[in-house]
A protein has these predicted regions:
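Short linear sequence motifs
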Residues: 40-42, 85, 107, 157
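Glycine-rich loops and low-complexity Gly/Arg-rich segments
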Residues: 36-39, 67-72, 87-92, 120-121, ...
């Protein structure tokens, strides 16, 4: 496992077209879960890792809420994510996972098969004001910009996570234990901006999901995140 002792996070969740989301996960043997109105759930999460077992780095995850193909999705997928990890069928398929160090990139790709690449990532969280940027590694221009001030919110827990990924032709299910309080907020002025000229695959996927100039449904933020990324288990 990889241990993360002292970290910050800004996570924004968006309701996106379910057919467009399904097109991005079908080849991995996964199916999207639908929320109210038949929409799929996509997340953009910016992380600032200040103390981990593999060093200091920043990371951004773009992911879609899914279950393995053929699995009956819960009627209320968001509520189901409050279950214990062993009983939670709903997880996230990571589409892109840029990081700022080669060590973090190698670990994620070699152990879990995560779609990591190395590029600069800016992270600034001051109160409820956030500014985060992923740089296009090819053009060195902004690929993704998430910024704004979160709206009214309440204290709450950070959710434990289930992650699905393909590794060595198998489907891995990985549990992520989290600890530390967060603020769960309305989106306020938070917006995602995607480069309309970048040809990088991450930019193409973000645009395909309709996340250019998108407003999240809600956001989580915290300066007290701790987590444990466990070894993945191959599903039968």
């Amino acid at each position: 496992p990889i241990l993360y002792y002292d970290n910050s996070v800004m996570m924004a969740l968006f309701r996106v077209d379910s057919n467009k989301a399904q097109a991005l996960v079908a080849e991995q043997g996964l199916q999207v879960v639908r929320t109210l109105g038949g929409k799929a759930l996509a997340g953009i999460a910016f992380y600032q890792y200040r103390d981990t077992s593999i060093g200091v780095y920043n990371e951004v995850g773009v992911a879609i809420a899914v279950v393995p193909s053929g699995t009956k999705a819960p009627r209320y997928p968001l509520v189901s994510m409050l279950n214990t990890l062993d009983k939670a069928p709903v997880g996230f398929c990571i589409l892109d996972l840029p990081v700022t160090t080669p060590a973090a990139c190698a670990a994620g790709r070699e152990i879990w098969g995560y779609p990591k690449f190395v590029t600069p990532i800016a992270f600034s969280l001051k109160g409820s004001q956030f500014d985060g940027v992923v740089t296009d590694p090819d053009t060195h221009q902004d690929l993704l910009h998430l910024s704004g001030k979160a709206g009214a919110g309440i204290p709450g827990p950070l959710l434990d996570l289930v992650l699905y990924s393909r590794h060595n032709a198998g489907l891995l299910r990985t549990l992520v234990n989290t600890r530390g309080g967060a603020h769960i907020c309305l989106p306020g002025s938070m917006r995602a901006t995607v480069s309309d000229s970048s040809t990088h695959p991450m930019a193409q996927r973000l645009r395909a999901l309709g996340l250019h100039h998108a407003r999240p449904a809600f956001v989580f933020h915290s300066h007290a995140l701790q987590l444990r990324l466990n070894a993945g288990a191959v599903l039968p």
